[in-house]
Amino acid sequence: MFVSAHSVFPSADCFGYRGGVSDISNIVILTGAGISAESGLATFRGPDGLWEGHRVEDVCTPQALARDPVTVHRFYDARRAALVEVRANPAHEALARLDAAWTGELLIVTQNVDDLHERAGATRMLHMHGELLSGLCAACGERFRWDGPMLAAPEGPFAAPACSTCGAAAIRPDIVFFGEIPYQMDRIEQAIARADLFVSIGTSGAVYPAAGFVRTARHHGAATLELNLNPSEGSIFFGATRLGRASELVPAWVDEVLG
């Protein structure tokens, strides 16, 4: 379903305004949990406010890691293992197709910590909230590819993995916890400032700083478009909104963009 959300762009096309491909050169796309939900990955917060049965405060804060590292590591080990059971869906594949075909600037900024964009073939992208398949040394800042569990002995005394660079037993999930600064914010803000089109896909519009990107984009003159299952908390700020399943909306939108 297409919803012309506001009178700012009353006859919005696939670019979120009255215009066409000749007016668009630089695109920034923000993706959230909604794009991966159809692959079988739980959204960050379900209707009950929990993430896979846990309060976010118990598994996604620096305080939780310090207080109960076993629970935190067990949680992310389970999320990492779950990635093996899922695959990229048509929405990821469509964005990878756009990534490959678009001759202007394009940046996919994902709030997701899975690797489904990469598996689909996207290359012009970044993870602002970190990655499940990465480990971070809290002592020296080195990052490592990490495919398996970090919790070597789930039932015994906790011991963090040792860093091969500095030797400290300080490896933690490379996840941006609440209270920490998202990654590559300078690059994201610069890309949004140059964007002609900002598109948000499958996001709640509730988590900052990402929830503020649409207003930044509009401030710099970009057209704005939301693709979501339901209107987000920030829908009012978009020039146009399309509602439906990401696996249907995103391929259709990419087809329109690429002609």
Residue ranges and their predicted role:
Residues F2, D13-G259:
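Conserved catalytic core of sirtuin-type NAD+-dependent deacylases
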Residues M1-V8:
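Extreme N-terminal basic, low-complexity initiation segments
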